[in-house]
Structure formats: structure tokens, C-alpha cells
């Protein structure tokens, strides 16, 4: 088995490319990132690791601008993501220079996935240990678009999705609570609440970007995230109190009837 997991382009006897699977494992060990569509907005949220006190926080940004209308978030190896982001930015600029038109979200996703796929077949390299979430609005179109790419070079369109170590729990939460036609505030609220299911309840551990058609991307300040977190916690406490009073109500009713 050791020969197969060292060779990039050699299949194991059961049809697996083990180096690609190791890249997927690097993604599963990465911090969580989510992206979801609203009615006419996109919200991208990522879990941020605790940063040493003397380190510049800007070096740990997990949401990058590829073009004015395209954002990319990732889970996995930071250095690998940096290479993919740089390649995506160059491709977006080349497309604009050659065709005098901004790149479409699907085209850019297909390009990034193509780069990842090439690194599963080429000699002298290894697969990227990164999954990406590519989101934005095509110029002149108000349709929100969210795509996910994987180390194997696969890409898919999503209404809401999650990647990283807690992606399963976050995606299950999104599946239960996401619906068509969410307003901007509802989409932001759902993004934060889904991240709170898997990260520590502090604004410093959450990075949030909101995209609207034809507007600059808005990165929410920690104070705003704090306010949303408090609202969600208050709602949970109120819901727990309602459930508790609902359970105790039958007992009270029975006692009064006997009296």
C-alpha cells in the first residue's frame, strides 16, 4: 500500500488515488467555511483560528477577493489556498483584458477546479490540500451563485454548503433551516447561527462577508457580529424557556383539576 500512497498518478488495486484522498483529509482538518444564497445576496462565513496576541490578524483572512464581484473562501492548507487565489486572480484579469468583459462565476470556478485536477495527474507535484467556495454575481445579473471545488478537481453549484472539519454538522443545520427567498438579514442570521453550531461563541472566531449585486463586498465588523450572536443566544434562551414552560403546564393543569 505504501507504494500507492506515494505515487500521485497510480491507482491502488481498489481504484483509489490515495494522494488525492490525503488532500481531502487536509480539508477535513481545516477550519469551517460556509456560503449560502439569499434572495438577492450571498453570505460567506468562516471560522477563524485564535491568533497570537502579537500577530497581525490580517494575515489570517480566509475570505479573499478574486475580482470586484467574486469572493473565494477556503478550508485546508493556507499556503495551497494562496497559490490557487493568485492563479484565479491572474485568470480573472486576463479574461478582462482579452475579452473586455468581467469573468463569470462559473467560468472562474471551472478554471480553479481545472487547476486542482491537473495537480492530480502531473508528475513532480502533489494535489492541493484545499476545498474552495467561490461566490458572486455575474455582471448585469442579480442571480446569486455559489460553487464548491474539491482537491480532486470536482466542482458543483450549491444553494448553501459548508467545508472544513465541522462541515457535516454545519451542512445538516443549513439543510434544516435554509429556504428559498431568504431576506438579507435572514441570510446573515442563518450564516451566523450555523457557524455557532460548530465554533466558539465569540465574534473574534467568525469572519463574515456579504455580497450584494452591483455593490462592494461588505466585511462585517466584529461589533456587528457580536450583536447578531447576542440576538441568536437570546432567541435560543427564549425558546428553551418556552419549551420548559410547555412541559410544566400539563402538571399545573392536573393539580388545579384535582383541587
Curated annotation (Swiss-Prot):
Cytoplasm among keywords: yes
Function: The proteasome is a multicatalytic proteinase complex which is characterized by its ability to cleave peptides with Arg, Phe, Tyr, Leu, and Glu adjacent to the leaving group at neutral or slightly basic pH. The proteasome has an ATP-dependent proteolytic activity.
Domain of life according to the entry: Eukaryota
Family label: Belongs to the peptidase T1A family.
Renumbered residue ranges of the record's region Disordered: 235-259
Subunit (UniProt): The 26S proteasome consists of a 20S proteasome core and two 19S regulatory subunits. The 20S proteasome core is composed of 28 subunits that are arranged in four stacked rings, resulting in a barrel-shaped structure. The two end rings are each formed by seven alpha subunits, and the two central rings are each formed by seven beta subunits. The catalytic chamber with the active sites is on the inside of the barrel.
Keywords (A to Z) from UniProt: Cytoplasm, Nucleus, Proteasome
NCBIfam families documented for this protein: PRK03996.1 (NF003075)
InterPro entries assigned to the protein according to its UniProt record, in alphabetical order: Ntn_hydrolases_N (IPR029055), Proteasome_alpha (IPR050115), Proteasome_alpha-type (IPR023332), Proteasome_asu_N (IPR000426), Proteasome_sua/b (IPR001353)
Record lineage: Eukaryota, Fungi, Dikarya, Ascomycota, Taphrinomycotina
Cellular compartment(s): Cytoplasm; Nucleus
GO cellular component: cytoplasm; cytosol; nuclear periphery; nucleus; proteasome core complex, alpha-subunit complex
SUPFAM superfamilies, sorted: N-terminal nucleophile aminohydrolases (Ntn hydrolases) (SSF56235)
GO biological process: proteasome-mediated ubiquitin-dependent protein catabolic process
SMART domains for this protein: Proteasome_A_N
Protein name: Probable proteasome subunit alpha type-4
Amino acid at each position: 500500500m505504501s507504494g500507492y500512497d506515494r505515487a500521485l498518478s497510480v491507482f491502488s488495486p481498489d481504484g483509489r488515488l490515495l494522494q488525492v484522498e490525503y488532500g481531502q483529509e487536509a480539508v477535513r482538518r481545516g477550519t469551517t467555511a460556509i456560503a449560502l444564497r439569499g434572495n438577492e445576496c450571498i453570505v460567506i462565513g468562516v471560522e477563524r483560528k485564535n491568533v497570537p496576541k502579537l500577530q497581525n490578524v490580517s494575515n489570517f483572512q480566509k475570505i479573499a477577493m478574486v475580482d470586484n464581484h467574486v469572493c473565494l473562501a477556503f478550508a485546508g492548507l493556507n499556503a495551497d489556498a494562496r497559490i490557487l487565489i493568485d492563479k484565479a486572480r491572474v485568470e480573472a484579469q486576463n479574461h478582462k483584458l482579452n475579452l473586455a468583459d468581467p469573468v463569470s462565476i462559473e467560468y472562474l470556478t471551472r478554471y480553479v477546479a481545472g487547476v486542482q485536477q491537473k495537480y492530480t495527474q502531473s508528475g513532480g507535484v502533489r494535489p492541493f490540500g484545499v476545498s474552495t467556495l467561490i461566490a458572486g454575481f455575474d455582471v448585469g445579473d442579480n442571480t446569486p451563485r455559489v460553487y464548491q471545488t474539491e482537491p480532486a478537481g470536482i466542482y458543483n453549484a450549491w444553494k448553501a454548503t459548508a467545508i472544513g472539519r465541522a462541515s457535516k454538522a454545519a451542512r445538516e443545520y443549513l439543510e434544516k433551516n435554509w429556504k428559498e427567498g431568504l431576506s438579507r438579514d435572514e441570510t446573515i442570521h442563518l450564516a451566523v447561527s450555523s457557524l455557532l453550531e460548530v465554533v466558539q461563541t465569540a465574534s473574534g472566531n467568525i469572519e463574515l462577508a456579504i455580497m450584494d449585486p452591483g455593490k462592494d463586498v461588505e466585511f462585517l465588523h466584529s461589533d456587528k457580529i457580536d450583536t447578531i450572536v447576542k440576538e441568536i443566544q437570546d432567541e435560543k434562551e427564549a425558546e428553551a424557556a418556552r419549551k420548559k414552560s410547555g412541559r410544566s403546564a400539563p402538571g399545573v393543569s392536573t393539580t388545579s383539576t384535582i383541587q
